[in-house]
Amino acid sequence: MSIEKVSILGKESIHVGYGIQSHIVEETIKCLASSTYVIISDTNMSKTPTYEKLQDSFQKELAKQRPQSRLLTYLIPPGENHKNRETKAEVEDFLLQQGCTRDTVILAVGGGVIGDMIGFVAATFMRGVRVVQVPTTLLSMVDSSVGGKTAIDTELGKNFIGAFHQPEFVFCDVSFLQTLPKRQLINGMAEVVKTAAIWDETEFTRLEGFAKRFLAEISAPTPNLESIKDELIKTVLGSVRVKAFVVSADEKEGGLRNLLNFGHTIGHAIEAILTPEALHGECVSIGMIKEAELSRYLGILPPSAVARLSKCLAAYGLPISVDEKIFSKIIGAKKNNLKIDSLIKKMLIDKKNDGSKIRCVLLESIGKCYESKAHQIFKEDIQVVMTDEVFVHPFANRHPESVSITPPGSKSISNRALILAALGEGTTRIKNLLHSDDTKHMLDAVVLMKGATVSFEDSGDTVVVQGHGGKLFACKEEIYLGNAGTASRFLTAVAALVNSTQDEKSVTLTGNARMQERPIAALVDALTTNGSKVDYLNKQGSLPLKIEAGNGFKGGRIELAATTSSQYVSAILMCAPYAEKEVTLSLVGGKPISQLYIDMTIAMMKDFGVDVTKSETEEYTYHIPKAVYQNPQEYVVESDASSATYPLAFAALTNSSCTIPNIGSSSLQGDARFAVDVLKPMGCTVEQTSKSTTVTGPPIGTLKALPEIDMEPMTDAFLTASVVAAVSQGTTTISGIANQRVKECNRIKAMVDELAKFGVSADETEDGISIHGVQLKDLKTPGGRGVKTYDDHRVAMSFSLLAGLCKDPVLIQERSTTGKTWPGWWDVLHSKFNAKLEGHEYIRQRSGSLRNGDRSIVIIGMRAAGKTTLSRWLAEHLNFKLLDLDQYLEKKLAVDIKLLVKEKGWDYFREKETEVLNECLEKFGKGHILATGGGIVEGEKPREALKNYTKSGGIVLHLHRDLKETVNFLSKDPTRPAYSDDIEEVWKRREKWYHECSNYHFYSTHCTSEAEFANLKLVFAKFVSKITGDDTFVLPATRSTFVTLTYPDLRKVPSLIKDVSETSNAVELRVDLLANQETAYIAEQIGLLRSVATDLPILYTVRTKSQCGQYPDEDEEGMRKLLMFGLKMGVDIIDLQLISSPSTIAEVISKRGHTKIIASHHDFTGDLKWDNVEWKNKYAQGVSIDADFVKLVGMAKTFDDNLLLENFRRQNTEKPLIGINMGPQGKLSRVLNKVLTPVTHELITDKPIGVGQLSLKEINQALFQIGGLLEKEFWVVGFPVSHSRSPALHNAAYAALGLPYKFDIFETDDAEKVYTQLMQKPTFGGLAVTIPLKLDIKKYCTELSESAKLIGAVNTVTPIADGRKGFLGDNTDWIGIANSFKKADFALASGVTNGLVVGGGGTSRAAIFALHSLGCQKIYLLNRTESKLQDLVDSFPDYDLEILLEKNASSVSIGLVVSCVPGDKALDETLMKKLDGVLSNNKGDKQTRPLLLEAAYKPRVTPIMELAKEKYDWTVIPGVEMLVNQGEAQFKLHTGYTAPYKVIHSAVLNE
């Protein structure tokens, strides 16, 4: 057994080896005499063979060596969330109960959680007992176990309470690592890499070489760490020795020890937010990169060192960005919580800080820290590094007069050098290689295909490539290239040379979304013509590509169009020496694009030993011999000439000087001519030698435009030229840059669009751009979201220059895109040019949470699904124009569709239909309802267009109804072209397409009567308001409830649904309890529920068996689909179980649209008490995924469980909590819960037994009994009021809901009496105000609602904050009028309706307000005394009011009438004559159904009602309906509850 010992604080107490359990036992018992030894571990570790062996060995050895001593064991739950005060106290209580004394020795066997917390127990128990650390994870071996730092976590951060307490021994048994999962092993490597990065470059280099073997071994199906145990021991020792040395020099972290916190300032802040999903090492890895970038930003660390650190961490499988795909999946929706303000708050309370000053370790090079101490860092600098958007402040006069800048290596040369070196034989040292995203992808690809071995020297500045002579092999992994265009083209050709292996027969190249749009077809065609087999895996002509291995490169004559990209030409040139036959490459069809880059490739091939000869007989033709590249010993990459244009342009724009010391006239790069050919003619002074270039800008404002310049030799530099031209005098026209339209973006269009934001106009030309320069003083500061960079590095860098010339800071989006060619550009701008930068965090709104506004809505669905009718309703509701795409097509082609199909067939029709769809989406993108034909989804192209529309935030609404009804309808309709297939078969074929092409779905219930159609229109309008964001669920300020429906089929209980749900704030549909979970059935059930409970929000729940439901837990995919279908149905609230997979949670959260989310967790075992940390974790999880509510349900086994829950509720207030206990003993929790309490109803007979459900009435009664509800008094006031039905209405509702309230009569005409005798009472609850007090009471109201102000009368008074802040005067008369019309099927009225108000009194004002709210375009007024009407017209200047004259009475169109004249008095003859004319002219029929509401409720039938109904067949609404409806609204204002409508209606009618 080999054991390495490391000294710390003068004692060899750290022992490292493999399989040293017996040594641990012997050494502990021999050296640490004690009466009691206590092994403390966690429940996971205790199940491992290594732990069991350790415990057994200890027991046996102790019996031999110290038989009088005893061994105790204690296990705690695993995980960081148990590293807290509570768990520490439990351990201490155990030790005390066992009679442990000060001679106790504790062995902490476990990872960092055990080591930290048990070390802290040892530090404080009996004022300090001895502790032995036995770390069992790689992370704890190299980090937490060494150095004596012990601690527990608090809510404010990690390790905030602890002590320095040195262990007697630290035993690092590497064999323990065999028990760890892969992710935990990788997690530990972060601290290993960190230690080498701050202290030992030699060890760092060893780690770079070990990464591949390490990852391969731990990724094996059955890992065997013994095969790499020597390397693992070296790895642990390397870190432990550094830490031991540092701790010995600075035990209490006074200075030097702070260096060990590299990566932790930012890493700990990230971890505090992402724990427990993200592991410590993962967060520290990301922290290291961010702190390295901070060092680079401050001008301390070279870019190559950042690149090297990134590559090393990534090689071990560690995340280097929170945006990495796998890491993002792990942390799920918690990623949304990584706000810069939150992170900085966490950093501000870091233990390393000096007061409130943030301190951070800065890296100077790999293996060395800057000044060997932590430094104070400004929040502003951290903000720049941590955000991907930046404000560039005005350059003003902060910049230096002259500066020398060395840009990174040329991207073009770097990529070519890597390809040539990988294909070559021998070892070459490449210096000044560009360390960027592009070259990183290239290096990774070369290594994956085994084309070369890559290592680093000179702190990463030198890349050592050992080429394998063109021997490349297929690999299992996809080769991901991001948006690296150069790499994709070169590697496509290289992949054609790849050999197959026994297991792998192909290579797959892929990239990001933009890369998958960029063209590569011309190169692929050339390769396939030459024998390669290449398949497009997605879009034809773009990546991803699958290239079959083993076909090789045939060679011979290859022709490429001269107009093709020079990168295609270079790709074939570089691979040509490895063809089976010598290659002749001919560029045909004119002068080649970017000839200079072709010349560059040929020159570089010569540097690597292959001479390309130009044909003497054919123009633009090259002969390439068969050969193997011979790698030169050293190759120095020239700085990137395209990148050099930015600092040179800075000098031009700011009247300063800039020198590029390593690019001159001898450069191979076309862009090296930028200074001489572009900046010099614009007025700059240019000095250029063969190796250097210096530019001095003219006085500010004197740059001259270039009337015409051909930039074909330096196309990438046109963007830089454009921003200089923007502030030059005159118009600059650039040509020869057509290829820039197919780069990272359409750069010419991007330049035109973004220049416009600066007030600079520019025009696209056939092969270029014209820019009309402006005076500097006329340059505008872009507003809103600033400059869009299109994920294009050159767009970002170019506009960073123009931004600094504006008067105010300019926002640049996606600044990290510069990583493609110049990762440190912003650092140079900041540290070399002294530009002030300010990091900006863009808080993205929830996906779909923006209101739809005027964006057009597309309708799809089967023929006869109701698209025509519902589309018309939709257009009316949104005030959009309706465009039927079939009619548009008929008009465009001047032919009937039925005839078109008959003559030219369905295929032709589908083709034209697709053209029309694309045209209409482009042309009518705003303010339209685009109704499509049923078969629009038949073609792939229209499906793609519809899906893209939803991805861009547009609404595609799928309308559907019962299929049998559709079949019945179509079989009777001869006007439509006949289906060639059975209708049901057509539906089966299309169903999946409708679902994938739409983001919303509406199911129309079958209607057989006008009332049902009216209700459907109302339901549909509410649905549309929800999905467009105009009417979303808002939690009431008062107590709220939802009623649960557990019926398998709602069709059997429609009337019951309305009665049991109307007093709740939402209704829960338990999807898991439905008869089946087919989406068609669920849609039908939701359609029915909406038609019955019209006004109630729907809570959509799929509960699994483990969460007290019926849905199978194992069907995760089925659950995901059901949840996504709920979102598609536009439900108001969705229940999302916290036990769902992170991917399901993330998808639901990201696609929630306007639906609110309840994050739920149920424990029906009762094992989890409310003081258990697991509940806190579940609540925190709900908060972290940004749910709107968190619902936690326990099981009460004792009455005290309710009190524990209330304590939990008080402590957790970040999100509204629905917290209840199930069971009979949990009823109190339902009474005390205020937010969306689940309730049952007296009418529900089959209630679940033993759950403890209560009705709303029972909750209120119990709440009153325990003092949660107090008695209140309400009155109707006025004169006369003795016959008022208000007391009957309100008291009936109080009784139904169990409210301890009383409503009475107070008859008076004196408002002061009301105020002094009623409103001042402590039990005052509110008033119903009638004549003559509706005006007088206003002076006693502190506030008036908008309706009360406009109507000018108050009929409802409620106290504000129990009267302490005064009283609110409101008016519900208008609601009574409006709701009476709505309940009388007003929704069926088509188009805009005009209204008429009869009378000129106070109620008339409420009637006008109501009719306006219903959308009446014009409101006519009719009264015996016309002077009163003029007052009304003057009071509502914004409403279109018109006094109805006798001559017009018989001709105006009117659909709604409100009679506001006394019902018990004879009417004026003139008035009756006018009214008779109106009623006669607008007689009722099936289409119009005009409505008349009588405001007077005595007598029951008034003369006006009789006239309208009997003589002219108008639908009349008696006054009692208005009384009930306004009383219902009044009740809601008084109590916060919805009154049971049947109850109050009966109470009013039963006199």
From Swiss-Prot:
Residues 1045-1258 are annotated as: 3-dehydroquinase. Its EC number is 4.2.3.4, 2.5.1.19, 2.7.1.71, 4.2.1.10. Its main location: cytoplasm. Residues 1271-1551 are annotated as: Shikimate dehydrogenase. GO terms for biological process: amino acid biosynthetic process; aromatic amino acid family biosynthetic process; chorismate biosynthetic process. The AROM polypeptide catalyzes 5 consecutive enzymatic reactions in prechorismate polyaromatic amino acid biosynthesis. NCBIfam families: aroA, aroB, aroD, Shik-DH-AROM. This is Pentafunctional AROM polypeptide 2. It is found in: Cytoplasm. Residues 1-379 are annotated as: 3-dehydroquinate synthase. Residues 392-835 are annotated as: EPSP synthase. Its cofactor is Zn(2+). Zn(2+) binds at E191, H264, H280. Homodimer. Keywords: Amino-acid biosynthesis, Aromatic amino acid biosynthesis, ATP-binding, Cytoplasm, Kinase, Lyase, Metal-binding, Multifunctional enzyme, NADP, Nucleotide-binding, Oxidoreductase, Transferase, Zinc. The active site is at E253, H268, H1162, K1191. NAD(+) binds at residues 42-44, 80-83, 111-113, 116, 136-137, 158, 176-179, 187. In the N-terminal section; belongs to the sugar phosphate cyclases superfamily. Dehydroquinate synthase family. In the 2nd section; belongs to the EPSP synthase family. Binds 2 Zn(2+) ions per subunit. GO terms for cellular component: cytoplasm. It comes from Lodderomyces elongisporus (strain ATCC 11503 / CBS 2605 / JCM 1781 / NBRC 1676 / NRRL YB-4239) (Yeast). Pathway: Metabolic intermediate biosynthesis; chorismate biosynthesis; chorismate from D-erythrose 4-phosphate and phosphoenolpyruvate: step 2/7; Metabolic intermediate biosynthesis; chorismate biosynthesis; chorismate from D-erythrose 4-phosphate and phosphoenolpyruvate: step 3/7; Metabolic intermediate biosynthesis; chorismate biosynthesis; chorismate from D-erythrose 4-phosphate and phosphoenolpyruvate: step 4/7; Metabolic intermediate biosynthesis; chorismate biosynthesis; chorismate from D-erythrose 4-phosphate and phosphoenolpyruvate: step 5/7. The keyword Nucleus does not apply. Residues 854-1044 are annotated as: Shikimate kinase. The gene is ARO1-2. ATP binds at G861, M862, R863, A864, A865, G866, K867, T868. Pfam families: DHQ_synthase, DHQS_C, DHquinase_I, EPSP_synthase, SDH_C, Shikimate_dh_N, SKI. 7-phospho-2-dehydro-3-deoxy-D-arabino-heptonate binds at residues 127, 143, 149, 159, 191-194, 243, 257-261, 264, 280, 351.
